[in-house]
Amino acid sequence: MANAGFQEKSEKVIETFDELFKDYDYIVAPSASCAAYVKVYYPKILEGKHECISSKKIMDVVEFLHDVLKVDHVPGKFPHVVSVHNSCHGVRELGLSSPSERHIKPFNKIIDLLNMVEGITIHEPERKDECCGFGGMFSIEEPAVSTRMGEDKIKRHMATGAEYVTGPDSSCLMHMAGIAKKENMPIKFIHVVQILAAGL
């Protein structure tokens, strides 16, 4: 609701979320865009009305595994070729990887974790941090543009030779998977945690 511009109408939902989760040490989300919205926008929406404690505690699952737990071993095997999807929110609001428009030392926390998986081959597509076209309400308000962006992104993932597209943003994966299914594009989609958990 807030993402669609109805910020005042979403205040009660945000306050309820905060009350439910504020006492936990960490709030871990399986979607980078959802985690980013809580972290970046919840405090702005509630500014001067309610202290949003949960926004300081939420993180994407990749952040949690990489930065908090500091995972250095994964027991699983995944003998497949994957192309990593770096979502807009993950890159630019959560810092999961280095954005191409900034001249900083390259890093990618998603790839750091995937490199621990036995048998995996990892690629990134050309224009690796360009949007897939989902963008929440954007995909509803501009479906033709959203679909075309998704098609272009999928084709670039496929050009890597990947069997799977993986990443930490459920909404991006869902968007691209829907387009690929509708258009019979021969590539699969899997959340990064499903790969990391393959040996559990």
Model-flagged regions — what are they?
Residues M1-L200:
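Iron-sulfur cluster-binding electron-transfer modules in prokaryotic oxidoreductases
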